[in-house]
């Protein structure tokens, strides 16, 4: 079961990072301008962020395996569409389709893990989930660099998308045999009005985060944020009212009465604000500041992966020993890693030894491996099975919004520092200082989230 579920998780996470390596070659071949390039990246993220809440609820109502299979098939076809795209318009459409498919899969995978496993098996399942996410994130750039340099069958950048085809086909073949169907036990009614409201609100919130920095934060971005606030307010009021009238809201307000879930969502947003922006500024520093090729910069990422693999493969054992301190300890270890990286960047500069970055990268990877999967498990620990899909959709949305927010904020910090100093090392260190603050805030939130409860083998706080 885990192998099939993680195939989809791996593909969707990989495509977030691997596309960054493919962009230069893609732009040259398809004659894509800056706006088109931005949409190749942003179209995927926007579709995921706006679709996961609705997809989570659809899984509760109509079957999580069924929705996962639909998403997996659509993602595989969309990858084919991207891989054979004759022009930039088709490629952007394929990326949006990939995002919608990822939105279908992501909450179903989390919901199935949360309902199919209990006790230590549940902790191990979430450890595998975290390991898969981390490996895709950390090694995505390396995998992309290898594929492009290998230029298999003359496919070049297209192989970064076509690599999903055999993975998707195999997972689809095994899915009916290995993954049981599951669904919520609540009222089988679909909240159409709630779906429309939350989708519009997320578009209004995420679109300016994605495009605001490059556009110079024009008036429309601030008007969009204001519209998002109004739409979210209307959505919350409608959900509460619908629940009181005996209806079936898209997101049951009871979910947020659990302190673990509501505070955990905030922690997830802040955590992913740091993760998405860290990978971005590190790649910029290595490729633009040090002039490394995508493949060579991907090799540097192996240092993070080494640390991550050490702790993520034994995350449930660490949780059993450290209890409620597991995630806080992981985030504080990440702070230490970023501080070491800040010092190492001062020595590496633009022409010094890149090896000066390695100690900080390893320590950051160790902390990331300790924090990622136990944090997800903690947030979902108190969710009733009937709400598993909706809760997983909300959690996935928090991750996407955090990532978009992180990229927007780090863009302001990094590029302002770059403009002021003219040097990538200074801009990178300014970005790291921002990330250290983000991780300290994350540590404070997860300390509060622990709330004095001890984690056992199940990963519960």
Where are these regions (language model features)?
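Transmembrane-helix signature of multi-pass solute transporters
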Residues: 74-84, 97, 101, 167-174, ...
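Transmembrane-helix bundle of Major Facilitator Superfamily
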Residues: 1-173
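12-transmembrane solute porter fold
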Residues: 1-21, 30, 221-222, 231, ...
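Membrane-helix boundary and inter-helical linker elements of multi-pass secondary transporters
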Residues: 28-29, 35, 60-61, 83-86, ...
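Hydrophobic/small/kink-forming positions within alpha-helical transmembrane segments
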Residues: 46-50, 80, 134, 138, ...
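Membrane-interface helix caps of multi-pass small-molecule transporters
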Residues: 25, 57, 61-62, 84, ...
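Glycine/proline-centered helix-kink
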Residues: 107, 133, 137-145, 202, ...
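Hydrophobic transmembrane-helix bundles of small-molecule transporters
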Residues: 149-266, 274, 292-293, 299-300, ...
């Amino acid at each position: 079961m885990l192998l099939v579920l993680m195939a989809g998780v791996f593909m969707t996470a990989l495509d977030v990072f691997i596309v960054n390596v493919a962009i230069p070659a893609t732009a040259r071949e398809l004659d894509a301008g800056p706006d088109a390039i931005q949409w190749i990246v942003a179209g995927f993220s926007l579709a995921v962020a706006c679709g996961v809440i609705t997809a989570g609820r659809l899984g509760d109502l109509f079957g999580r395996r069924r929705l996962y299979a639909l998403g997996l098939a659509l993602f595989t076809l969309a990858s084919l569409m991207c891989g054979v795209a004759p022009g930039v318009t088709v490629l952007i459409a394929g990326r949006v389709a990939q995002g919608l498919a990822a939105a279908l899969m992501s909450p179903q995978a989390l919901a199935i893990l949360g309902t199919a496993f209990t006790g230590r098996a549940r902790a191990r399942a979430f450890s595998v989930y975290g390991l898969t996410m981390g490996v895709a994130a950390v090694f995505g750039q390396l995998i992309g660099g290898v594929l492009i340099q290998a230029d298999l069958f003359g496919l070049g950048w297209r192989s970064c998308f076509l690599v999903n085809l055999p993975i998707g086909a195999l997972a689809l073949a095994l899915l009916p045999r290995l993954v049981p169907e599951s669904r919520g036990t609540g009222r089988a009614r679909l909240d159409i009005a709630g779906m429309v409201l939350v989708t519009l609100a997320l578009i209004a919130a995420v679109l300016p985060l994605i495009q605001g920095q490059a556009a110079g934060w024009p008036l429309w971005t601030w008007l969009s944020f204001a519209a998002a606030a109004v739409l979210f307010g209307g959505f919350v009021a409608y959900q509460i009212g619908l629940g009181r009238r005996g209806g079936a809201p898209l997101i049951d307000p009871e979910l947020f009465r659990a302190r673990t879930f509501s505070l955990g969502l905030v922690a997830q947003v802040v955590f992913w604000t740091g993760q998405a922006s860290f990978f971005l500024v590190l790649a910029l520093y290595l490729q633009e500041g040090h002039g490394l090729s995508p493949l060579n910069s991907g090799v540097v990422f192996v240092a993070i992966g080494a640390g991550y693999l050490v702790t993520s493969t034994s995350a449930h054992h660490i949780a059993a020993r450290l209890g409620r301190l597991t995630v806080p300890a992981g985030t504080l270890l990440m702070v230490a890693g970023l501080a070491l990286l800040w010092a190492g960047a001062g020595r590496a500069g633009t022409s010094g030894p890149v090896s000066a970055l390695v100690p900080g990268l390893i320590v950051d990877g160790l902390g990331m491996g300790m924090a990622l999967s136990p944090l997800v498990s903690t947030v979902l620990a108190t969710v009733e099975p009937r709400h598993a899909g909706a809760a997983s959709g909300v959690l996935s949305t928090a991750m996407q919004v955090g990532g978009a927010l992180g990229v927007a904020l780090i863009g302001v910090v990094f590029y302002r520092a770059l403009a002021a100093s003219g040097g990538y090392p200074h801009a990178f260190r300014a970005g790291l200082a921002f990330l250290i603050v983000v991780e300290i805030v994350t540590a404070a939130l997860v300390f509060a989230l622990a709330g004095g409860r001890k984690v056992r083998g199940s990963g519960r706080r």
